[in-house]
């Protein structure tokens, strides 16, 4: 996994520490305070698994809330999760930011956004 991808997945800034190869610092802002913690590779993998786990649980909950149907056309096949506000723009994996859509509607959403 690349550093950039890990930062995107976790929402944390990740820097490799020079003295100990394989160690990472993980930092996040809480209010106006920066919390930084050094973690090893195993902890980093656990953090990544936690982020994926949260996404999985919230995705399923969003699907359930919508009756396992596309929020746009109400189809029930080929469902995907659309982030209303992208992670790259500060969006989260919170349920209110997730929208279940079918593959066709998902493509259409992104096509419309690119054309604006």
Named regions from a protein language model:
Residues 50, 78-81:
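Low-complexity, intrinsically disordered short segments enriched for Gly/Pro and polybasic residues
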Residues 71, 80-86:
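Histidine-centered catalytic micro-motifs used for acid/base chemistry in nuclease
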Residues 2-3, 37-69, 89-92, 96, ...:
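Short, charged surface segments at domain edges that flank catalytic/cofactor-binding sites
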Residues 71-72, 104:
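Short, cysteine/histidine-rich loop/knuckle motifs that typically chelate Zn2+
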Residues 78, 98-116:
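Short Cys/His-centered divalent metal-binding micro-motifs
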Residues 1-31, 57-66, 116:
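Short helix-coil boundary/hinge micro-motifs
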């Amino acid at each position: 996994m690349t550093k950039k991808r890990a930062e995107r997945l976790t929402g944390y800034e990740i820097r490799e520490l020079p003295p100990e190869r394989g160690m990472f610092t993980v930092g996040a802002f809480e209010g106006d305070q920066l919390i930084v913690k050094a973690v090893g590779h195993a902890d980093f993998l656990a953090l990544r698994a936690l982020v994926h786990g949260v996404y999985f649980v919230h995705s399923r909950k969003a699907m359930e809330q919508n009756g396992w149907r596309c929020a746009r056309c109400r189809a029930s096949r080929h469902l995907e999760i659309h982030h209303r506000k992208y992670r790259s723009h500060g969006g989260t994996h919170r349920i209110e930011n997730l929208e279940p859509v079918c593959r066709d509607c998902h493509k259409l959403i992104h096509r419309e956004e690119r054309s604006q």
